[in-house]
Amino acid sequence: MIAHHDRNGVCCRALFCSALQPSDAPTPDMVATAISRAIQQFGIGGCASWMAQEFGDHPDAAASRMRWVRQLIAQRSATRQQAAA
């Protein structure tokens, strides 16, 4: 089983690589679908590689996107924890 923080890391990398944009005003279902599609399309390692490339090529844009991604994943985790309680 993947540890919670590792799962969040995988989800962050996958969501970073997805086509989902802040302007989409993503719902939790949209986030889950984007994560699944990115993992299917690129694989876990591919998502990490693509993300690293973006940070190398466009560090400011990548940092901004990662802040947004981490916010979405944190909200997703909080919602899941509340539902489990």
Protein language model regions, located:
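N-terminal acidic leader/helix
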Residues: H4-D29
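A short, ordered amphipathic alpha-helix with a cationic face
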Residues: I2-H4, S23-A25, I35-Q41
